[in-house]
Amino acid sequence: MSKQQPTQFINPETPGYVGFANLPNQVHRKSVKKGFEFTLMVVGESGLGKSTLINSLFLTDLYPERVIPGAAEKIERTVQIEASTVEIEERGVKLRLTVVDTPGYGDAINCRDCFKTIISYIDEQFERYLHDESGLNRRHIIDNRVHCCFYFISPFGHGLKPLDVAFMKAIHNKVNIVPVIAKADTLTLKERERLKKRILDEIEEHNIKIYHLPDAESDEDEDFKEQTRLLKASIPFSVVGSNQLIEAKGKKVRGRLYPWGVVEVENPEHNDFLKLRTMLITHMQDLQEVTQDLHYENFRSERLKRGGRKVENEDMNKDQILLEKEAELRRMQEMIARMQAQMQMQMQGGDGDGGALGHHV
């Protein structure tokens, strides 16, 4: 009789090993198979290089170059919402990236109501998610909530404009704000540092809540702790974007060519582009968690306080029609039941009369 081989479910080499240590691998495989979803909103005046920066960040032509509107167009220019979704795959990991652009923001002569459209869009995505979450098919919910907002600040001023302050205060309880100084190549290093400090002071002065990177855990390696410290010290990020490849020091780099030299997009000594991209990639999960646990929960609690979830007009009409049909059906069933009862009583009465007459005869 041959000796029976141990099955693959038995691990005699490591007695006492249950297998819980493999759970992170299961979560990783499931997440990679499902893919990730992320929505990024970009807000800022025309001409600050928003489209170029987004294309540079994700190495894709997500946005065409826009034409800066003329003075006549700016008189009554309205804010639009343009959402573009692209599937990005890198080493087997899929990312469904949605970038929400806001052309027209800050371009009109009167900007008093220019950000109402943006706030309405953010609330609509919360509303849609709440509606889907409360429905029957909860396994296939598409998350279009805005997880992060890059707010572009002009480098040509001396800090925040009144519009910047008003807009950020209007959305800071709805979305994670990451302030970005655009076109950093127009500033010297000293000017850049002064502008950063001025913006941070004004953000604190006006009690604006921007996204704060979480502290590194105590068990993280020293390199990650140092990276987190540098990222925090770089806020607001001063960036340069470019989709052009130029030759610098014998190699091809993305950058901008000037008479006095080359500004390299991915050179940390020239600007904070790499730091901004690193922050977005390494903290993408945290941005989603803050959106879910803080901003969405605030919206959901407020909605429930006001009497439950808001139902769209179309759904409300459908529900109303169904209720009316059900009420009509119940009335018909009750009427049929009464008619059947009357017929039953008449039949019983007829049988009694017939029996008496037969007995009398």
UniProtKB/Swiss-Prot annotation:
Sites of Phosphoserine modification: S218
Gene Ontology terms: biological process: cell differentiation; cilium assembly; cytoskeleton-dependent cytokinesis; protein localization; regulation of L-glutamate import across plasma membrane; regulation of protein localization; smoothened signaling pathway; spermatogenesis
Chain positions with Phosphotyrosine modification: Y17, Y211
UniProt-annotated stretches for the region G1 motif: 44-51
Modified residues annotated as N6-acetyllysine in this record: K190
Tissue: Widely expressed. Up-regulated in liver cancer.
CDD domains named among the record's database cross-references: CDC_Septin (cd01850)
Swiss-Prot/TrEMBL site (Important for dimerization) positions: F156
UniProt keyword terms in alphabetical order: Acetylation, Cell cycle, Cell division, Cell membrane, Cell projection, Centromere, Chromosome, Cilium, Cytoplasm, Cytoskeleton, Differentiation, Flagellum, GTP-binding, Kinetochore, Membrane, Mitosis, Nucleotide-binding, Phosphoprotein, Spermatogenesis
Segments crossing the lipid bilayer: none
Subcellular location: Cytoplasm; Cytoplasm, Cytoskeleton; Cytoplasm, Cytoskeleton, Spindle; Chromosome, Centromere, Kinetochore
G3 motif: annotated segments: 101-104
GO molecular-function terms, A-Z: cadherin binding; enzyme regulator activity; GTP binding; GTPase activity; identical protein binding; molecular adaptor activity
Region (Important for dimerization): 260-270
Gene3D superfamilies recorded: P-loop containing nucleotide triphosphate hydrolases
InterPro entries named among the record's database cross-references: G_SEPTIN_dom (IPR030379), P-loop_NTPase (IPR027417), Septin (IPR016491), Septin2 (IPR008113)
Region span, G4 motif: 182-185
Domain Septin-type G as annotated: residue spans: 34-306
Residues at which GTP binds: 44-51, 78, 104, 183-191, 241, 256
Additional remark text: Coordinated expression with SEPTIN6 and SEPTIN7.
Function description: Filament-forming cytoskeletal GTPase. Forms a filamentous structure with SEPTIN12, SEPTIN6, SEPTIN2 and probably SEPTIN4 at the sperm annulus which is required for the structural integrity and motility of the sperm tail during postmeiotic differentiation. Required for normal organization of the actin cytoskeleton. Plays a role in the biogenesis of polarized columnar-shaped epithelium by maintaining polyglutamylated microtubules, thus facilitating efficient vesicle transport, and by impeding MAP4 binding to tubulin. Required for the progression through mitosis.
Assembly behavior: Septins polymerize into heterooligomeric protein complexes that form filaments, and associate with cellular membranes, actin filaments and microtubules. GTPase activity is required for filament formation. Filaments are assembled from asymmetrical heterotrimers, composed of SEPTIN2, SEPTIN6 and SEPTIN7 that associate head-to-head to form a hexameric unit. Interaction between SEPTIN2 and SEPTIN7 seems indirect. Interacts with SEPTIN5. Interaction with SEPTIN4 not detected. Interacts with SEPTIN9.
Entry similarity comment: Belongs to the TRAFAC class TrmE-Era-EngA-EngB-Septin-like GTPase superfamily. Septin GTPase family.
Name of the featured protein: Septin-2
